[in-house]
Amino acid sequence: MKNNSVKIVVATGIGAALFVIIGWLINIPTPIPNTSIQLQYAVLALFSALFGPLAGFLIGFIGHALKDSFLYGAPWWTWVLGSGLIGLFLAFGVKRETLTQGIFGNKEIIRFNIVQFLANVVVWGIIAPIGDVLVYSEPANKVFTQGIVAGLVNALTIAVAGTLLLKLYAATRTKSGSLDKE
């Protein structure tokens, strides 16, 4: 258990740092204010798949809080929580044992993308906007529009870049029974 907790702490630190750096360097605006294409969610997908839901939550939560603090002066806590929840849910879209055995085929890709799409719809389309209305007294039509756009953009980003990262990672793993004795 101790070895696992050390891995989670290290993965959280590295993952959160990557979340901040990628979010800072690659921020593609959309027509909706304060909403952009965020490639760090693809990296969050990989880390969540490899290190589990706790690491995924912490990477998303800490990474988003730090990114907001550095870029905007203060975190927007309802969306910080949303990033943590996305990291948590992404871990349930991939069977870690299968991925580390080098298996990430069509069945795994479909499962991963169903889970990540549903997570994005629920987190960004429902939870974060309701939080914005309750915590920050934001206008509902504004935050639900932002949430829906963010959810769809993040789902597309994860579907393309996250799936690609997971597929590339699986390709680096040796499949059991793949070595033949000469």
Curated annotation (Swiss-Prot):
Record keywords: Transmembrane included? yes
Subcellular location, principal: membrane
S-S pairs:
none
Q: Keyword Cell membrane, does the record have it?
A: yes
Q: Which UniProt keywords apply?
A: Cell membrane, Membrane, Transmembrane, Transmembrane helix
Q: Which residues cross the membrane?
A: 8-28, 42-62, 74-94, 114-134, 146-166
**Which domain of life, per UniProt?**
Bacteria
Q: Where in the cell is it found?
A: Cell membrane
Q: Give Gene Ontology CC terms.
A: plasma membrane
Instruction: Write down the membrane topology.
Output: Multi-pass membrane protein
Record's family? Belongs to the UPF0397 family.
What the entry lists under HAMAP family is as follows: UPF0397
Protein name as it appears in the record: UPF0397 protein YdcD
